[in-house]
């Protein structure tokens, strides 16, 4: 944030950490996208959506809840679900309790592609992150990421969060 005296610039250490964070997250997302494209023919976000549905009761979830869980805009979710439907991995149905709402449902084909792609994905995550860190670092990383995620999700109905757009 700025002040009357100008912006409060990052220190050299903060700048170094920020650049390391940007590089690591960009490279990690690319690593996971390439692995999933190669092994399952889908980008990482599609895999994440299938996982959310697989973990949901009866493998179904309201579209608005799915966008919230995946931390993506409703538009991006709608596009992704349309692609997953074309593959036969997900289907949509109207929500019986709210005529405006829709549920996304993981199909048997979606369960199968998830079952086949999960071992390679877990291996890629382990190789990229957990094999490089000691147990204490894993704990610290988890704590740091939870603090950051919590701080980026303000309370209140006026909060500008992706799934509300």
Question: Model-flagged regions — what are they?
Answer:
Residues 19, 51, 115, 142:
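A cross-family signal for key residues in well-ordered alpha-helices
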Residues 76, 80-83, 144:
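Residues within the DNA-recognition helix of helix-turn-helix
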Residues 39, 86-89, 151:
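Residue cluster at the C-terminal edge of the helix-turn-helix DNA-binding motif
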Residues 28, 32, 70, 113, ...:
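Alpha-helical linker/hinge and terminal dimerization helices associated
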Residues 30-73, 160:
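N-terminal helix-turn-helix DNA-binding core of bacterial DNA-binding proteins
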Residues 1-12, 135-165:
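C-terminal regulatory/oligomerization modules of transcriptional regulators
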Residues 3-6, 82-140:
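Charged, amphipathic alpha-helical coiled-coil/dimerization segments
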Residues 1-40, 165:
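N-terminal leader segment of winged-helix/HTH proteins
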């Amino acid at each position: 944030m700025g002040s009357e005296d100008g912006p409060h610039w990052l220190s050299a250490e903060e700048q170094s950490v920020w650049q390391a964070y940007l590089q690591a997250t960009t490279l990690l997302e690319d690593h996971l996208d390439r692995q999933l494209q190669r092994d399952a023919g889908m980008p990482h976000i599609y895999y994440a959506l299938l996982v959310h549905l697989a973990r949901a009761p009866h493998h179904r979830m309201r579209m608005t809840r799915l966008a919230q869980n995946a931390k993506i805009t409703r538009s991006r979710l709608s596009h992704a679900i349309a692609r997953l439907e074309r593959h036969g991995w997900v289907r949509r149905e109207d929500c019986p309790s709210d005529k405006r709402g829709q549920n996304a449902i993981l199909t048997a084909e979606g369960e199968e592609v998830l079952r086949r792609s999960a071992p390679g994905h877990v291996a890629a995550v382990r190789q990229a992150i957990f094999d490089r860190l000691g147990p204490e670092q894993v704990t610290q990383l988890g704590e740091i990421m939870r603090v950051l995620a919590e701080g980026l999700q303000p309370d209140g109905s006026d909060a500008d969060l992706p799934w509300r757009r």
